[in-house]
Regions:
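Extended repeat-based scaffolds of very large eukaryotic assembly and lipid-transport proteins
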Residues: 20-179
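Sec-dependent signal peptide recognition
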Residues: 1-8
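C-terminal motif of bacterial Sec signal peptides marking the signal peptidase cleavage site
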Residues: 13-16
Length: 179
């Protein structure tokens, strides 16, 4: 009887340990964001030889878009940022240098995740970098501009999120685009 009780307690403890891992096939957006912020996201692609490659993007779906857009109001710059899943095909580093620290703006990154879901792609572009294609095509957006773009996404989602084949994408005609 004591062995069964001990086994049950250990099972509960072990099950509780897994709650801090993001299931990339059925992700929890809030847990993903928490892990990005505290630097503990650790789902990586691996070689057959067991070498770590790059962080794997969770398989977000349309049900996750409202949470991604809601959490995109956070324009905190996160550093270190080497645990952020980015497009492995890109040769550009997606972060901003703040002082001498590479950082990723969380809100911009989450909008990029939402755009990928809306487009039905693994990644929205090569890089999670928003630009104003008309006025400042060679500069990244600042936090106020990111929040303006977030409003475009929210308005678009409210009007089109229920459609299987929306007539446009959130940034169409806005002058903003993904790098």
């Amino acid at each position: 009887m004591k062995i069964l009780t001990l086994a049950a307690i250990l099972a509960v403890i072990c099950i509780g340990c897994d709650k801090n891992t993001v299931d990339v096939n059925n992700p929890d957006v809030e847990e993903f964001v928490k892990q990005l912020k505290d630097g503990t996201y650790n789902n990586y692609a691996w070689t057959e030889g067991g070498e770590r490659l790059w962080p794997v993007m969770p398989a977000f779906d349309r049900d996750d878009v409202p949470a991604l857009l809601a959490l995109a109001e956070d324009t905190e710059l996160i550093s270190p940022c080497d645990h952020f899943p980015v497009n492995p095909l890109s040769s550009m580093y997606p972060w901003r240098l703040v002082g001498s620290k590479p950082s990723i703006m969380l809100g911009e990154y989450l909008l990029w995740c939402a755009e990928a879901v809306i487009e039905g792609q693994d990644f929205a572009s090569l890089n999670p970098v928003l630009i104003d294609e008309i006025r400042k095509p060679d500069q990244r957006l600042d936090s106020d501009e990111i929040l303006s773009v977030r409003k475009l996404y929210q308005d678009w989602w409210n009007a089109n999120g229920h459609l299987d084949n929306p007539p446009s994408l959130p940034l169409d005609g806005s002058g903003y685009g993904w790098h």
